[in-house]
Amino acid sequence: MIWLELAIIQRALIGCVLTGFLTGLIGVFVVRMRLSSIGYSMSHGAFAGAALGVAISSNPLLTSFLFSAVTALLIGPVADKARLSQDTITSIAFPLNMSLAFIFLTLSPQVGLSSEVASVLWGSVISMSNKDILFMAILCTATPTLIGFFWKELFAIMFDRRLAEADGINTRPFVYFIIFLIGIVITLSLKLVGGLLIFALLFNTASTVLQFLQEMRKIIIVSPIVGAITCVSGLITSLAFDIPVGSCIVLVSTLIFAMSVLLSPKRKRREVKEPN
């Protein structure tokens, strides 16, 4: 196919593989540690930051990272210090970030739904730069290394946080670490998938793999692979039908998840156990 020879498409293809790898990996922790509401708030925090970057004609990646960091602080250490539940903080942070995002986009000097504004909302094939690819490649190397280094503690927390604490593990630093990691992954994936859709990719891939596998080590290995395949499939669909890449990636991931639920061995076992 001719479009595969274009440098823009090649960057997008590499970006899809790296994005799918990262979201598939971090998504396991989001699902298993029950951080779905936190991931949702983090994604919209990054979205608000990117919108601010567009409004002030600054680097959306930088402002997105700053907003993600602030949101992570509010959800993690600040919530604990104030003795507020994470659900309370995320319930406040989500509408606040969405409100700020649309205010910033309204104040944007660009006319109408420009390409930069559209990429913040829905993602864009042409928005990936060599610098973005480099950052994602570094994160793809650093993240599995850090997870492997702290695997014993993280596995215990994923299994049961209270039991991990009873076993003498200080769980808070590790939960904060995962929250900040979620923010970084979302920030770097924002250009490709878009701020309104990135959370679906975090949740769908891991949930799909969990329909078939139970051993955590296998899940950690398979989920990034499924994520990469999903993103590449979404990119190809986007190019074939000329529709936003982020929407296609999320649509493909949702269809794969729906199929996994129908074909899941867990579902079949439940049907066998149910009395007639």
Predicted features and spans:
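Short loop segments and helix-boundary regions at transmembrane helix junctions
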Residues: 28-111, 209-221, 238-241, 265
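Membrane-interfacial amphipathic/re-entrant helices at transmembrane-helix boundaries
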Residues: 1-21, 271-275
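Loop-to-transmembrane alpha-helix initiation sites
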Residues: 12-15, 60-66, 87-91, 137, ...
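Transmembrane alpha-helical segments in multi-pass inner-membrane proteins
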Residues: 191-247
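Cytosolic-side transmembrane-helix boundaries in multi-pass membrane proteins
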Residues: 243-276
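Helix-loop-helix "hairpin" substructures at the membrane interface of multi-pass membrane proteins
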Residues: 129-205
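Transmembrane helix-bundle core of multi-pass membrane transporters
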Residues: 9-11, 90-148
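Small-residue-rich segments of transmembrane alpha-helices in multi-pass membrane proteins
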Residues: 45-55, 93-105, 123, 127, ...
